[in-house]
A protein has these predicted regions:
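Amphipathic alpha-helical
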Residues: 1-5
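RNase H-like nuclease fold core
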Residues: 8, 13-59
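RNase H-like nuclease module associated with reverse transcription
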Residues: 12-13, 52-166
Length: 166
């Protein structure tokens, strides 16, 4: 019996879930970013980290998390291509904040805060270059939710069940 797969995978999908918990740290006021990246159905990257600057809005926290997710998508595409895996479809990044989704998908949107404006242009550049595609997802279905805030046992069990069976 041969345990080594004999088929080469022609192409893999990249799916990234990102979330933020605004002003999670009560001492510093910094938000927390959570990201889980899947190549195919396998989680290959996950991280929960405190954001480096204080955001004054939930939108700012979520958009900062989206920018980090785009950086992960770009890196994963590079690594996979360097191993000879074809990547022709954009990486899908799932966000649960409707305002972030609408602004990231709208090239006519403008942001006033300079740091967010730069993050916006970074995200938009990769959307227009067909490197990433932003998708909206319900908060209950966002795998990264468990990396940003404590969940009750039922929510955690449901999320882990979905995570392990998909």
């Amino acid at each position: 019996m041969n345990s080594v797969p004999n088929k080469k995978v022609k192409e893999l999908d990249i799916n990234i879930f990102c979330d933020a918990d605004h002003a999670h740290d009560l001492v510093t006021g910094r938000s927390v970013t959570g990201i889980i990246a899947f190549v195919g159905s396998t989680p290959v990257y996950w991280k929960s980290t405190r954001q480096t600057s204080v955001q004054t809005s939930t939108f700012g926290s979520e958009f900062t998390a989206l920018k980090k997710a785009v950086e992960v998508a770009v890196s994963l595409r590079y690594y996979l291509r360097s191993m000879g895996v074809q990547i022709s479809k954009p990486a899908k990044i799932y966000v649960d904040n409707k305002s972030v989704f609408l602004n990231a998908a709208n090239p006519a949107s403008s942001l006033n805060k300079k740091a967010l404006a730069l993050a916006y242009h970074f995200v938009r550049e990769h959307v227009s270059g067909n490197v990433i595609e932003i998708q909206h997802i319900r908060s209950e279905d966002n795998y990264a939710d468990c990396l940003t805030k404590p969940l009750n046992s039922t929510m955690l069990r449901n999320l882990l069940y979905e995570f392990m069976t998909n």
